[in-house]
From Swiss-Prot:
<keyword id="KW-0244">Early protein</keyword>
<keyword id="KW-0808">Transferase</keyword>
<keyword id="KW-0548">Nucleotidyltransferase</keyword>
<dbReference type="GO" id="GO:0044423">
    <property type="term" value="C:virion component"/>
</dbReference>
<comment type="function">
    <text>Part of the DNA-dependent RNA polymerase which catalyzes the transcription of viral DNA into RNA using the four ribonucleoside triphosphates as substrates. Responsible for the transcription of early, intermediate and late genes. DNA-dependent RNA polymerase associates with the early transcription factor (ETF) thereby allowing the early genes transcription. Late transcription, and probably also intermediate transcription, require newly synthesized RNA polymerase.</text>
</comment>
<keyword id="KW-0804">Transcription</keyword>
<dbReference type="InterPro" id="IPR008448">
    <property type="entry name" value="RNA_pol_7kDa_chordopoxvir"/>
</dbReference>
<keyword id="KW-0946">Virion</keyword>
<dbReference type="GO" id="GO:0003677">
    <property type="term" value="F:DNA binding"/>
</dbReference>
<dbReference type="GO" id="GO:0003899">
    <property type="term" value="F:DNA-directed RNA polymerase activity"/>
</dbReference>
<dbReference type="Pfam" id="PF05864">
    <property type="entry name" value="Chordopox_RPO7"/>
</dbReference>
<dbReference type="GO" id="GO:0006351">
    <property type="term" value="P:DNA-templated transcription"/>
</dbReference>
<dbReference type="GO" id="GO:0000428">
    <property type="term" value="C:DNA-directed RNA polymerase complex"/>
</dbReference>
<protein>
    <recommendedName>
        <fullName>DNA-directed RNA polymerase 7 kDa subunit</fullName>
        <ecNumber>2.7.7.6</ecNumber>
    </recommendedName>
</protein>
<comment type="similarity">
    <text>Belongs to the poxviridae DNA-directed RNA polymerase 7 kDa subunit family.</text>
</comment>
<comment type="subunit">
    <text>The DNA-dependent RNA polymerase used for intermediate and late genes expression consists of eight subunits 147 kDa, 133 kDa, 35 kDa, 30 kDa, 22 kDa, 19 kDa, 18 kDa and 7 kDa totalling more than 500 kDa in mass. The same holoenzyme, with the addition of the transcription-specificity factor RAP94, is used for early gene expression.</text>
</comment>
<keyword id="KW-0240">DNA-directed RNA polymerase</keyword>
Amino acid sequence: MVFPLVCSTCGRDLSEARYRLLVEQMELKKVVITYSRKCCRLKLSTQIEPYRNLTVQPSLDIN
């Protein structure tokens, strides 16, 4: 299930931007330019996880 990504300030749907970042693997810089509102740009820059290779397990620090 895919949850929608919505800007909490203005209510704009940002799911298309997440698709372009994660599926099409576009650069964040190119996607952010398409949004004129600063609140949407901030949301995209801080709330979307970078693309990860999920086949590699992270090493755990036990200390």
